Amino acid sequence: MILVGGENLMDMIQVGNQNENALFEAVPGGSPYNLAMAAGRQGVQVGYVTPISEDSNGDQLAANLLSSNVRLLGPRVSAPTSLAMVNIEDGIPSYAFYREGTAERLVTLDKLIQNLTGEVAIFHIGSLALTSGSDASIWEEFVGEAMDKGVKVSLDPNVRPSLIAEPDLYRQRIKRLMTKVDILKLSDEDLLWLFNDSVDENSALSELIGIVNADIVILTQGSKGSLIWHYDNWYEAPAYPVGKLSDTVGAGDTFMASVLVWLTKNENLKRLSVIELKAKKDLLYYAAKAASLNCEKQGCNPPWENELL
């Protein structure tokens, strides 16, 4: 099973105006939430461990995961659902988040550990859940607990600079995790923000490789494709062509989910360190195709297994 932790929220997307008032559509979201949904649609076992609110937004979040074949392993709680105000220009989203006192932050280490059953092969974490507060510390501690039980760990920082009140502390946390995890994916924007002392992308990549111990390290570059690390070199893979771009919401999450699905289906999770370059390129092709199909639909709407055959 792929176990997923991290935020769930409602994306509030302005769809028009009425009587001088903005009209918004509420769409389920959150980077790890999107990843769980994307993986569940691709025919592997997925469990989502983050609490979900009992409010109407939470009902929609829960129903959306269940319809995508994701098991809800976290509790339903009375606190409200987190919100993200989304502005989309030329298909590219920007966000403002409201997460104080919300359901997805009410994690406890004891309840998380209860989900580390023999079914779990890999745990994925990332994005807002690691930004600040006691919940960020709990997630970091849970990574250690998972690794102690032989569970592989995957990280996608998916950095949101506007939400990070203490950048230095956040960078330290992410870099600590980078030294531990088995699978790491980050975007070129994540890379330059996290390694802000580097003068360019190449020096940032060198600094990254100097601290990671992951067997799978991927850098995504949007329409330029992606890079993967293999025996002391970076290798390029092109982006998969997008038929007609709707927007890029959830593209990175779909890509990361597809990486984990491919590794799971091809029984590579136990042999990450010896995967050959050709297989790694096949992995990137599969993930890029899934992300491309998501970009052809409005919002995060990842492809189903039959669409990727």
What residue ranges belong to the model's regions?
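Glycine-rich phosphate/adenosyl-contacting loop at the front of the ribokinase-like
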Residues: 1-68
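Short beta-strand scaffold segments in enzyme catalytic cores
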Residues: 37, 83-87, 225-229
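Conserved phosphate-binding/catalytic region of the ribokinase-like
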Residues: 3, 144, 198-309
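Conserved beta-alpha-beta core of the PfkB/ribokinase-like small-molecule kinase fold
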Residues: 128-207, 224-225
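Short, conserved phosphate/pyrophosphate- and ester-handling motifs at nucleotide-, phospho-/glycolipid
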Residues: 39, 187, 252
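Conserved N-terminal subdomain of the carbohydrate kinase-like
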Residues: 45-127
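Structural alpha-helical scaffold elements that stabilize or flank donor/cofactor-binding regions
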Residues: 115-116, 176-177, 210
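Short, well-ordered alpha-helix to beta-strand connector turns
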Residues: 119-120, 181, 214
